[in-house]
Structures are given as C-alpha cells and as structure tokens.
Amino acid sequence: MQHARQHRGRRVRRVGTPLSSIQHIKQGPSEEAKRQHIKRLRMKKQRAQHAQRSHRPRTNSPRTSGKSPKNSLRIQKPIRDRWAAIAEETQRIVLGDGQYVEERIVPAVSSAVAQSYTQGSSFVDPLISSLKALQMQPAHIAHNIFSQIQLSRQGTIFFPHYSDSLANWATAQKRALPTLSQTNIKFVHDSTLLAARQLAQSMSSNTSRIGVLSFASPKKPGGGFLHGGDEQEETIARLSSLVASLTSPAAQDFYKEHKKHWSEDGSGLHDHSMLYSPGVVVFRADGDDEEINLGDPVGGAFISPYQIDVVSAVPVNAAAVRAKHIILPSERQFFEDGIRGAMKERMARILRVFEEKGDKVLVLGAFGCGSSQNDVEVIASLWAELLSF
C-alpha cells in the first residue's frame, strides 16, 4: 500500500504493502471539520461495541445463555485455564520426545459368553448373551511421533512477500495434474480440525494429502495458544505439532518479514508472506469432536495421529484498516474494495502454494472473519471466484 503523509510541509510517499485502492485523501478545511465530527461519533460507537463484546461469551466456548456477564466470565476462565494446560502439554510433547499415550474405549466381552457355548444343559442365545455381557473398557495405546515432527520442521518452507512464483499465480503455467472426474465443495459447520479428521478417516492412504489453511498471527508462533486462546490458529497449535514448524529457522524469516512490513505500513493490511508446513501431526481432538470428547467442550483428548499440510498466512486486519483511516460514507466502498483486493491476492497465493505442493483436498474456512472482521460474504465470494479460476 502506498500512502502519503504530511512531513515538515512536504508530501512524502512511503512504500509498504502494495495496495493502491486505500490512500490518504487530500482534505480541505471544511472537510476536516466534518471528518473529525464523524471520527468522534465513530469512536463513541466503537467503544460501546467493544464494551458489549467484552461481556459476550465466545461462540465456541460452553454455552452461558441466561448467565450474567460476571458469571459468564467466571465460567470461561476455568475453560481457558484447561486450554492453556493442554497447550503446555502439547508443546512439551512436540518439542520433546514426541511420545504420548492414547486412551481408547473399546468393547470387552466377559467370560460368561464363552462359557455359554460350552454348557450343554440348556440353550443360550449367543447374541443375547453377548449383548448382556458387553462392557466397555479403556485400552492404552502408545504413540511416538518424534520422527514425523522432525520431518515436518525440516521441510517447512517460507514464501516471501515478493515471491515471483506466487505473485504470478494468474499467469503461471500450471503443473500437469491428473484429471479429476469432478470437484466437490462441501460447506460444514465444524471446526478446522474436526473437518480435517473426518476427511482423513474417509480417505485411503494412497489418495491426496489434506491441506489446511491456518489464520496465522503475524507476531508469534501460535498466537496466544499457551495462554488459553481459542482463535483458529491457536486451536490448531494446541492440538497438533504445528508449533514445531512455526519455531523453525524458516518461520523466523516469516515473522521478521511481517515485522518489517508492519513498521513500514502499519495499516493492518499485512504482507503476502506465508509458510508451508508439510506433514503436521494432529494428535488431539477438538472441542466439537463429540465422537471423541463425549460432550466435553474443552477437547484435547489424545487420538490416533494423522497428518495435514498447513499453509500459515495472515489475513488482512479489516478492523484495523477501518479504524486507522477516517472514512466518509462516500469513501466506504473505496476502502472496502481495497481490502477485498488485498485479500483476493493473498487467497490466490494460498491456493497456488497448495497447488504447487500437490494438496488437492483442502480445508479453507472463513479466512479472517473472526477478530480481523473481514466480511464473510466477501470471503466466500472470493473463494468461489478463485476456485473456479
């Protein structure tokens, strides 16, 4: 993005994230008074909205309807403390020896069933006896994912903001891929990792790998996952080996580039750099995975490991862009078009990375529609446009 600033009586242009749609607009004295008035009204409205949001329970936290705000916060704190404890244990496993024990509940049949087949004094229906004698018992299964974690960490690839292979996504010669009979697009109201696990269960070992988009923090690996955060990337980091990749040497370049662009631009558009983490191991269940968690909304139960390929990219922080600029009603569409243009470029590069790496089964999601406040209809339309490109 290019924008102009007043500096010692002259106009200076600073180059940041390339987006021409959002620029400062030259203002006259009468316009300035109008802008300041609108800004005061908007700030008052934002403060009211922020106060309302601070007392609103999170959608993927346990339901707290009918509770007072204070009671809701008291309910959520233990949940977040448990998420933080799970995240710390996950990090110890991932950055340690990679070993954990899965507890799986399996059916067990008592010896009475076997005896019924050998007793000849009276007839015993084997099916009825089996159902009566059926019990459930825990089975403990040890897993060692150390080697796969190291492969994922070593295979992590950094794609810089000025990546020629990604910047030319619209005109690049596409690699020859096997012709598919059809492309299936499915909309589900599930978490990212629940959708990924269901795909992993339905796919045979010789089919395509699963690509997952992670809505990355521009500042630190996994965002606030160690503090009980439950944003999308934080959840993935809490339940998988992603943190090993995000702390790799390649990832350090990713965070350095974001810091550099933020210091140059600072508008919330962020840059187009991204990470590709192959073979990330998922070994814990998400909170909405009722098959595993049996109604516990916290999640985190150990499961049999499966692998996903993760692209970590930072969405445009639309909320920050709107807050940074004084936007008149007549200018609103101008700014929204700029945000849309930046998101389209970033999302196209994400798909290009998956295409280059051969990931044909993707879990994408509402990229940047949480705290970044991108419009969900805009993001859906962009995915539709790019997937049919």
Question: What feature does the model see in each segment?
Answer:
Residues 2-362, 366-389:
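Macrodomain-like recognition of ADP-ribose-binding/processing modules
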